[in-house]
Structure formats: structure tokens, C-alpha cells
Swiss-Prot record:
Gene Ontology terms describing biological process: follicle-stimulating hormone signaling pathway; G protein-coupled receptor signaling pathway; regulation of signaling receptor activity
Keywords: Disulfide bond, Glycoprotein, Hormone, Secreted, Signal
Keyword Disulfide bond applies: yes
Classification via InterPro entries: Cystine-knot_cytokine, Glyco_hormone_CN, Gonadotropin_bsu, Gonadotropin_bsu_CS
Protein name per the record: Follitropin subunit beta
A Pfam family reported for this protein in Swiss-Prot or TrEMBL: Cys_knot
Compartments, as annotated in UniProt: Secreted
């Protein structure tokens, strides 16, 4: 009986920790103001769960850093936006995550807000695939 309980606990632990932060395929909308439309492209980004906690008693000396699923490494890829005006720059570079980890959110390169615009937001009504 103890062996069965051990295996149940082990698989529950594995399901929680191993299915955490990982690369995920997403579709994002890219746009340029000069082109006046959006296109959808596929890329990879980090998504998942990280072990975190919110302390009941806040300690002003020790900051409470929440861990989030974020990129560890990424590269930029470039796409040519079709239909732009001749004088407009039609090249658009976007990030592609290559590795993920649980860490603090880097506000210099990432939208860390709870209610961001989202990857499919488009300023223009017309969208091209």
C-alpha cells in the first residue's frame, strides 16, 4: 500500500513541476503605422506555471519577488510586411523564444502587466493573414 501511495504522490509532484514553464506556439499580430494593416505570424513564447507565493505579512526589508514564466534566451526574426508604401520600412523584427525558465519579469523587454493588450491586438480594422 505504501508503494502505491508513493507512486501517486510522485506522479502528482511530477505533473505539477514538470508541466510548468515551457515553450509554446502563439500567433501574434504585427503592424506598422505606415502600412495601415496587420498580419498574423506564428512564433514561440514562454507559457506555464511557476511556483510562487504571496506573503501575508510584507517585509519592507526583503522584497517579495514573484516568479513568472519568462524567456531565458530568445532571438529576433524578421518578416517583410507586404503592401507598405514605398517610402515605409516594410521589415518588422519580432522575438522568438528559444528557452524558458521561472524568474522575475524583466520590465525592460517584457510587458509584465496583468492586463496587457495581448498578442493578437491590432490597431487597424483590416487584418491580412
Amino acid at each position: 500500500m505504501k508503494t502505491a501511495q508513493f507512486y501517486v504522490l510522485f506522479f502528482c509532484w511530477k505533473a505539477i513541476w514538470c508541466n510548468g514553464c515551457m515553450l509554446t506556439n502563439i500567433t501574434i499580430s504585427v503592424e506598422r503605422e505606415e502600412c495601415e494593416f496587420c498580419i498574423s505570424i506564428n512564433t514561440t513564447w514562454c507559457s506555464g506555471y511557476c511556483h510562487t507565493r504571496d506573503l501575508v505579512y510584507k517585509d519592507p526589508i526583503r522584497p517579495n519577488v514573484q516568479k513568472t514564466c519568462t524567456f531565458k534566451e530568445f532571438v529576433y526574426e524578421t518578416v517583410n510586411l507586404p503592401g507598405c508604401a514605398k517610402q515605409a520600412d516594410s521589415l518588422y523584427s519580432y522575438p522568438v523564444a528559444t528557452a524558458c525558465h521561472c524568474g522575475s519579469c524583466d520590465t525592460d523587454s517584457t510587458d509584465c502587466t496583468v492586463r496587457g493588450l495581448g498578442p493578437s491586438y491590432c490597431s487597424f480594422n483590416e487584418r491580412k493573414e
